Amino acid sequence: MSSSHTVTVSMDVEAGQKNKDKKGISQDLILAYKTLGVVFGGLVTSPLYVYPSMNLTNPTEEDYLGIYSIMFWTLTLIGVVKYICIALNADDHGEGGTFAMYSLLCQHANIGILPSKKIYTEEENLISNQPVVAGRPGRLRRFIESSIIARRLLLLTAILGMCMLIGDGILTPAISVLSAIDGLRGPFPSVSKPAVEGLSAAILVGLFLLQKYGTSKVSFMFSPIMAAWTFATPVIGVYSIWRYYPGIFKAMSPHYIVRFFMTNQTRGWQLLGGTVLCITGAEAMFADLGHFSKRSIQIAFMSSIYPSLVLTYAGQTAYLINNVDDFSDGFYKFVPRPVYWPMFIIATLAAIVASQSLISATFSVIKQSVVLDYFPRVKVVHTSKDKEGEVYSPETNYMLMLLCVGVILGFGDGKDIGNAFGVVVILVMLITTILLTLVMLIIWGTHVVLVALYLVPFLLLEATYVSAVCTKILRGGWVPFAVSVALAAVMFGWYYGRQRKTEYEAANKVTLERLGELLSGPGLRRVPGLCFFYSNRQDGGWLTPVLAHYIRNMRSLHEVTVFLTLRYLLVAKVDGKDRVQAVRRLGPAGVYGCTIQYGYADAIDFEEDDIAGQVVGALRERVVDGEEEGERVEAARAAGVVHVRGKMRFHVGKDTRLFDRVLLGFYELLHGACRSALPALGIPLQQRVEIGMLYKA
């Protein structure tokens, strides 16, 4: 009887595991289909503009074979080996991108700049879902931990990587849509350039207006379009290979690259600024990881995107070998006339989709940096109940829209944008290589020989590309570079202002003894209700100086007051059981403290999460002595909840040193324009109170 029962249970467990695996596979396949409409748009539509962006002069068959060989190995090494096989494994709880890798490093080594970036339980034990390699901190880790300069350089590198991804996001939509719509001018030469520009701008405006409905809804509409594109272009490529140059795949031999550079020398090096466009968009599949999953991106890339690009570029090159001067319209000229208009429609729709990958990636990295307090607060909306990494930012969306339209109207031609394109893309890839190397050494504990086998070839490849694209800066490449630098300046200005506020709070702290004196002062009243008083710091038994300012001027404090510290962590998500921590009594009657912890990918909504209920429950469970005190806490909550937050501002006077006057003045400008913290936490309007306080810089 017992044996039969054991067999039945075992079979049930196995059946359950199989069902779970089937469900996981089917979910990955569905997500893989959706990635076509979001992640790979920029990469898979690159055949529209790669050859037209090259400044070729009297190209020969050998030149085209060398160019195809370069593109094939670039796609294989950077796309397959670097991103699909290695980088996607360096995720932070499902989140990708340069900033996610930086946060991952901060979790496993003491290299972060801002405080309060670890998850603590009640016993203050560090929680990590990533394995730490014991006994292998290495000299590199110790050096970075001990050097403030190295730590700041690492932070700056991560910030630049994020900003350059956004700079890339400005050009991708513009060049994709312009290159597609430019196909009208082939059969209809009378169509003017301003008409193409206006139509392209109108299409992009429509795309940006769709973003508020969420990535899932947008990708569900866009995935069929990209599926048609990834099927149609390689089919035409195979036809072109068969008709024009069946031996094109001999160019997969790397010796054609050597011959290309031996023949063209400096000119060949300059042409790398065009061939690099074949991999633009690959960086988005890592940054968009939070919107999907690692396996879904790997499935889609290896089964669809990579074969499609290899065959499409092979077909284009085969056509151009027989029509050497058609490179300036290298895509539409290689499309057979009977299918020209169907391909024009698909290309236009695919170009619209291509814009989505960088838009989604931009939303992800902005959300990460806002939560970690490296960027001014902008509104971030979670557009999916099932996928927490799927977000939308209205301010970011409309700023991108204006910049994209400005690029179209400013450059006016896809070929001119091609000169500007690729500068920041390859820099993002180089930064990814550097951060990934640190992840291998510090977190994964990879043997130094294997790390060298990764680092040396990719560093040489990407550094060579960087040297080539730098020649394009004066021909328009300065635009995305300038946007990236401007964003980095915003982040540094914000970070500097936050650091100065932290220093001021430490110098003007309110100790628990001082709190007792303030509460025992004459004329102070305790009013009914539960008050959450937001304090940036509770470390070492002291509170924010805004508290003393509040008590001195209001002459009152709520009957039950909880000093609440929000801790935004360098981890993607915090488990619900670790949300409310460090609950304790702070001395005077009815005064408590606690910490609320969130990861940068968590959806934050105090009302929906019932934070007030969680804190009251934690107080009754861990702190409150006796039924009477517990009833007092519950009665205070029933009387009304209020959230009080100090809004400390810098007063920049004439006697302030010039450096601080510039940076803190810039910070105040940003601070005045950004959103308040309380609405971002999902706190109802009637429960919000903000107390202003000036600090002389």
UniProtKB/Swiss-Prot annotation:
It comes from the Eukaryota. The keyword ATP-binding does not apply. Residues 1-29, 88-152, 211-217, 293-300, 360-390, 444-447, 497-697 are cytoplasmic. The chain crosses the membrane at residues 30-50, 67-87, 153-173, 190-210, 218-238, 272-292, 301-321, 339-359, 391-411, 423-443, 448-468, 476-496. Keywords: Glycoprotein, Ion transport, Membrane, Potassium, Potassium transport, Transmembrane, Transmembrane helix, Transport. Glycans are attached at residues 55, 264. It is a multi-pass membrane protein. Residues 51-66, 174-189, 239-271, 322-338, 412-422, 469-475 are extracellular. GO terms for molecular function: potassium ion transmembrane transporter activity. GO terms for cellular component: membrane. It is found in: Membrane. Disulfide bonds: none annotated. GO terms for biological process: potassium ion transport. InterPro entries: K+_transporter, K_trans_C, K_trans_N. Belongs to the HAK/KUP transporter (TC 2.A.72.3) family. High-affinity potassium transporter. This is Probable potassium transporter 4. The gene is HAK4.
